[in-house]
Amino acid sequence: MRPRLQNFNALRARSYLTRLPLFTRLIVLAIIALSIASLQSVWNLREWGALIPEEISITNAYRLSTFPLIHLNVIHAILNLLALTPLMERFETEHGTLTSLALFFGPLTSIPAVAYVLIERCIFRANHGVLGASMWVFTLLAMESIQTYKSNPHFVIGSVNIPTWTTPLIMSLVVAALIPGTSLLGHLCGIAIGYVAGFGYAKLLAPPEWGLRWVENRLNLLKILPHYVSIDKTTYGRFGVLPTTNRPGPSGSAATELVGTTQRLGP
């Protein structure tokens, strides 16, 4: 019975991994590759890519985008991957590969990173560097908590009604208390931009949809890229698969079933 259960779990895990959309796959592979590359001692990859407030300048602005991909050690990377992968997969499935790329290597990363640097330097007068994808995790959690709040405003513990939108805030405090060395400020900056995006203001941050559609059609991305998710959320690229659970949308088209609402974050 036990070997059969193990085989079943292995098959489910393999099936899940083979269905991951393109951007999520690339993020997972990049984190794994950079974690392996960080093991060598010839070049300090962590020092190069960390978000260090006093190191941010025009020539080092790449740090605003590289820090989520680099981790302190293998365990740090594994824990963040376990938390990030399902959240990123749901986001990309709903909003498309190009939109995910534009947002996560754009405003959803750079805005909280700049906020962290400014608060560290101007308010705390400190220079604590941060690494890891946990800021992305809390950004995505905050976005989902807002969507959940719209349909289920409270959850109950004992006789206390707790707003569902506070879930990522509670989790960030628990993580800060239980795991030494974590950046509460970094997580709070990620949560803040997640709340903004969750309320629908990401359309002010994302590139215009007509531009993304033009790129998608011009480069014929649906045909040439495996597991690419179209902006219209109904079509995957070659070798990709459709979402396992669909329901009719308002116009009769299929829409991916996600936790909470299916409201777009794009324009």
Curated annotation (Swiss-Prot):
Keyword Transmembrane helix appears in the UniProt entry: yes
Gene for this chain: RBD2
Source species: Gibberella zeae (strain ATCC MYA-4620 / CBS 123657 / FGSC 9075 / NRRL 31084 / PH-1)
Record field: catalytic activity: Cleaves type-1 transmembrane domains using a catalytic dyad composed of serine and histidine that are contributed by different transmembrane domains
UniProt name for this protein: Rhomboid-type serine protease 2
EC number, as in UniProt: 3.4.21.105
Subcellular location: Golgi apparatus membrane; Golgi apparatus, cis-Golgi network membrane
Keyword Transmembrane among UniProt keywords: yes
Record-linked Pfam families: Rhomboid
Region (Disordered): 247-267
Membrane topology, from the record: Multi-pass membrane protein
Coiled-coil residue windows: none
GO cellular component, one term: Golgi membrane
Tree of life domain: Eukaryota
Family (UniProt): Belongs to the peptidase S54 family.
GO molecular function: serine-type endopeptidase activity
The entry's keywords: Golgi apparatus, Hydrolase, Membrane, Protease, Serine protease, Transmembrane, Transmembrane helix
Gene Ontology BP annotations: proteolysis
Transmembrane segments: 20-40, 67-87, 99-119, 126-146, 155-179, 185-206
